[in-house]
């Protein structure tokens, strides 16, 4: 379960921001999670509760926004929706389509005190 290490990285990023911005508590963390990534939202939520225990983020709410897959088809010069990695273009059928969205995990927003 690599979700633990992903959440540990998020908590480390939050701790780094605390040192820069001098806040005392995190109330909410919003993640942008790619639908084509290999992290499961429910597993991230489960790990979040365990990993944040005893940290500045303990008790914070975790919101997860799912980013749908998109790619650029160089054959038909269009941005197209992707439902899986390494898929052919749903418009022209050519492959490969260069993925442009849907594989990310980013901290999009934090509410702090």
UniProtKB/Swiss-Prot annotation:
Under the heading InterPro entries, the entry gives: HypA/HybF (IPR000688)
Q: Which Gene Ontology MF annotations are present?
A: nickel cation binding; zinc ion binding
- Lineage: superkingdom: Bacteria
Q: Where does Zn(2+) bind?
A: 73, 76, 89, 92
Pfam families reported for this sequence? HypA (PF01155)
Q: Which UniProt keywords apply?
A: Metal-binding, Nickel, Zinc
Q: Where is the signal peptide?
A: none
Where is Ni(2+) annotated to bind?
2
Gene3D superfamilies in alphabetical order: 3.30.2320.80
A Gene Ontology biological process noted in the UniProt record is: protein maturation
PANTHER family attached here? HYDROGENASE MATURATION FACTOR HYPA
What's the stated role of this polypeptide? Answer: Involved in the maturation of [NiFe] hydrogenases. Required for nickel insertion into the metal center of the hydrogenase.
Q: Which family does it belong to?
A: Belongs to the HypA/HybF family.
Q: Protein name, please?
A: Hydrogenase maturation factor HypA
């Amino acid at each position: 379960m690599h979700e633990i290490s992903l959440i540990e990285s998020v908590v480390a990023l939050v701790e780094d921001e605390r040192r820069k911005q001098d806040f005392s508590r995190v109330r909410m963390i919003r993640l942008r999670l790619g639908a084509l990534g290999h992290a499961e939202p429910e597993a991230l939520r489960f790990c979040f509760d365990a990993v944040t225990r005893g940290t500045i983020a303990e008790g914070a709410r975790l919101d997860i926004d799912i980013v749908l897959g998109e790619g650029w088809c160089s054959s038909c010069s269009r941005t197209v929706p992707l439902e899986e990695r390494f898929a052919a273009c749903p418009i022209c059928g050519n492959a490969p389509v260069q993925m442009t969205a849907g594989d990310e995990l980013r901290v999009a927003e934090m509410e702090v005190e």
